[in-house]
Amino acid sequence: MDPSDLAWILAAFALVSLMFPGLSLLYGGMLGGQHVLNTFMMVMSSLGIISLVYIIYGHGLVLGNSIGGWGIIGNPLEYFGFRNIMEDDGTGDLMWAGFYILFAAISLALVSSGAAGRMRFGAWLVFGVLWFTFVYAPLAHWVFAIDDPESGYVGGWMKNVLEFHDFAGGTAVHMNAGASGLALAIVLGRRHSMAVRPHNLPLILIGAGLIVAGWFGFNGGTAGGANFLASYVVVTSLIAAAGGMMGFMLVERVFSGKPTFFGSATGTIAGLVAITPAADAVSPLGAFAVGALGAVVSFWAISWKKGHRVDDSFDVFAVHGMAGIAGALFVMLFGDPLAPAGVSGVFFGGELSLLWREPLAIIVTLTYAFGVTWLIATILNKFMTLRITSEAEYEGIDRAEHAESAYHLNSNGIGMATRTNFGPEIPEETVPDAVQVGVDKQKIADTRKASK
């Protein structure tokens, strides 16, 4: 690998790593204050779980030579312990292995949307290993493993047989995580109270900003080096993020009366999800359109979720699953032959076979991810209890599972502290939810005003 290409992949790796604290802050801000630390733990522990299993056998499952030549799953022993990529052979294989660790880990972190505030942490760790092995790894092999006839290497069927176009993981990462998060949410059931509003919008702002920065590495690094393709997909990603932000604010204004900051952050991420499978296959104007489309579809899906009381806490199915579908279908219809991928959508004279190949890949991805995740969670629940007790849920999962609290609010509603096993216990008068404190103070102020 050319040194300049390796330098860009290393830089992209660093950018993608920002998505983990970013997702922690985004998700932590979206729940009540008594769930923040558990949310952080679920996201960050994904990196720990996946790093271990990926080094042992995961890289072989994802990018190993397909067992039997069927394109279903790679050989888990081919890269066992990374033993055969420990020397510099000029291919950059070790760096790519690290890059794919981040892809797998962020996918698992997204699935935590279906478990937020109610899943035992130990059960989450076990679930993460099983989910990577039986859900993520096969899907990633189908999409990321590319045939090499000269060496006899056989990759995944979806990429090589179906010839499905997915630039950077719209299927293996986003649709997969969306369907899996929905399945996990259904198995676990709803929280006792779903009426908790985002407790900290500044956390959401910081988290969304880090995720956007990480996405430039996510898509840009997939280009494989410091080249025109990398610059192209970074720019289309930026444009799609803008389209998502504007699209979500518009539909929010039309249907809800006012555009919100939270909505603009959601739309931005939906736009980035939508461009992920399409970043190299659309024009700059097409990138804006696909971002806006992803946001509109996500808005509709979030509204549907609320109407059906599905407790997908961070809307992973609406934002990642549905926007990912929108991006893939956009390529099918509006792929621009002048873009680097050279894929012509149906409206640009492309093959009519796109009309069944792209939807087939989407349907298989959603069905497999949802079905196997539901099966894993259901069976696991027979052997170990997945959900915390009602008492622990009311107390707050941070205290129940981690013996810590993100906030300690005194009688004036200010102050921060934390309790660990190594420090003093926080007094019982602690109020865990900063939003509720604000509501109570406002009620007091209104009462005083009315009495004057």
UniProtKB/Swiss-Prot annotation:
Quaternary structure note: Homotrimer.
InterPro entries for the chain: Ammonium/urea_transptr, Ammonium_transpt, Ammonium_transpt_CS, NH4_transpt_AmtB-like_dom
Functional description taken from the UniProt entry: Involved in the uptake of ammonium/ammonia (NH(4)(+)/NH(3)).
Highest taxon, organism lineage: Bacteria
Keyword check for Endoplasmic reticulum: no
NCBIfam families: amt (TIGR00836)
Compartments, record wording: Cell membrane
Molecular functions (GO terms): ammonium channel activity
Residues annotated as transmembrane: 6-26, 43-63, 94-114, 126-146, 167-187, 201-221, 228-248, 259-279, 282-302, 314-334, 336-356, 360-380
Keywords: Ammonia transport, Cell membrane, Membrane, Stress response, Transmembrane, Transmembrane helix, Transport
Annotated membrane topology: Multi-pass membrane protein
Family the entry assigns: Belongs to the ammonia transporter channel (TC 1.A.11.2) family.
Keyword Membrane: yes
Induction: By nitrogen starvation.
Organism of this sequence: Corynebacterium glutamicum (strain ATCC 13032 / DSM 20300 / JCM 1318 / BCRC 11384 / CCUG 27702 / LMG 3730 / NBRC 12168 / NCIMB 10025 / NRRL B-2784 / 534)
Name of the molecule in the record: Ammonium transporter
GO cellular component: plasma membrane
Bridged cysteine pairs (disulfide): none
